[in-house]
């Protein structure tokens, strides 16, 4: 078998309600918003359908390079009302259920799925057949796993890199991220830079939410608003707080950690010499220059 060199990262954004049973005896494949623990802002754009596109796209890419890539669903136990199940676990369970359903049914038309989702399902089904990979091998063979401590997008990237190393005994040589298109600058310009991961080795595939029945004017405003909110609530904050150790971003992280999970990976970049975690980095650029630059296992050689 070829060695695993590529991390295919899916940052998770919600928790699928696996125990929710439709009243019409249909199957819960995440196709309706009520099958998810959604925040109020996640309804307008049918975000739950975008989540499914992210995961299916990752699995499609995996099947195209099965021997050299690992898919990691990344997200912690962020919702008290969901109980002690992580975002990553719920994605994993949903996609196993969805793909088993697709492989056991000739008709793969899932109600409420749009044409993009139907095409992705068809492509995944065809790849499984042509590659002679069964569902057990796909999900239980080590090619798809979870990272269950991330509380924000910075965590998604850095923790998934360390999770990849846990699974494959080496760090990824390249990373493909499948997420919302409007978040790409955050991942590439902020997070990759902050951890000194070579930006040229990262590919970002953007799949945005898509409101139903909007005309072009409404869609343009919707996407413009997304970009503005991203800049206000994330990009500008991470630009001045690279490692999310200061008040606003740290408060967000704490609000997403109702079960008080502690990530084992954090010590790799945030620990003092005495082993205690650093809180509130005063000068991110100085910290980067003295602690991170050219010192990470994946850093490019010093020129």
Swiss-Prot record:
Keyword Cytoplasm (UniProt): yes
Gene Ontology cellular component list: cytoplasm
Localization of this protein: Cytoplasm
Record-linked InterPro entries: C57A10.07/YOR238W
Keywords of the record: Cytoplasm
Further information: Present with 892 molecules/cell in log phase SD medium.
Name of protein: Uncharacterized protein YOR238W
Organism: Saccharomyces cerevisiae (strain ATCC 204508 / S288c) (Baker's yeast)
Source lineage: Eukaryota, Fungi, Dikarya, Ascomycota, Saccharomycotina
